[in-house]
Amino acid sequence: MKGIFLVLEGIDGCGKSTQIEHLAQWLPLSGLMPSAAKLFITREPGGTRLGKSLRQLLLGTSPTDESPKPLTELLLYAADRAQHVSQVIQPKINNGDWVISDRFSSSTLAYQGFGRRLDKSLIKELENIATQGITPDLTFLLEIPVSESIKRRENTRKDRIESEGEIFLKRVSDGFSYIAKNDNWLVIPANQKKDIVSKQIENKLINYFQNISSLKNERS
């Protein structure tokens, strides 16, 4: 039996890391996971040893003072994802385990496609290669206003992508809202107290797996 692949997406400051930490504690005790399944938490970029080096280049924490151009940036994200899928996500899912990733391919479409305004058809072509056909079972978009994102990050050290201006971030936010119209996306208003957001995610997951169970029973 294959495992489950969950992804949390959203603009910077939306609270993904906080909610993933909560899920890491809640899911194994929720009764949703098979007893033999393990839960793995990962992220993009940087979900592998190679990916950590790529993350430094992409986010501007590398010793080099040379920033990648937009097309180079896109290709580096694709390289990170190809390694991540091959080395982490695919093997874990094939083993029946559950994987939660902080960002996946939709972040590339939102940031590089909508934010950088790179060719979206090229991005999708690269993503098809990098993901090797892997798609999340469910993606949560933690949605906050751009103004709230900026406010939350006021006194934090920003990486290269986070340092982009408000106009760029608005394009990214609009991109996520557009992408989230696809199937298997759930939008959570994240401009609320953390525990309220956590409870909404829990309820959505419970409903999702109950519906899957009902469909299986109908077909059997």
Swiss-Prot record:
Matching HAMAP family: Thymidylate_kinase
GO CC aspect terms: cytosol
Keyword entries, A-Z: ATP-binding, Kinase, Nucleotide biosynthesis, Nucleotide-binding, Transferase
Top-level taxon: Bacteria
PANTHER family: THYMIDYLATE KINASE (PTHR10344), UMP-CMP KINASE 2, MITOCHONDRIAL (PTHR10344:SF4)
Stated role: Phosphorylation of dTMP to form dTDP in both de novo and salvage pathways of dTTP synthesis.
Binding residues annotated for ATP, in chain numbering: 10-17
One term of GO molecular function: ATP binding
GO biological process: dTDP biosynthetic process; dTTP biosynthetic process; dUDP biosynthetic process
InterPro entries xref list: P-loop_NTPase (IPR027417), Thymidylate_kin-like_dom (IPR039430), Thymidylate_kin_CS (IPR018095), Thymidylate_kinase (IPR018094)
EC number: 2.7.4.9
Native source species: Prochlorococcus marinus (strain SARG / CCMP1375 / SS120)
Gene name per UniProt: tmk
Reaction catalyzed: dTMP + ATP = dTDP + ADP
Family per record: Belongs to the thymidylate kinase family.
Stated name of the protein: Thymidylate kinase
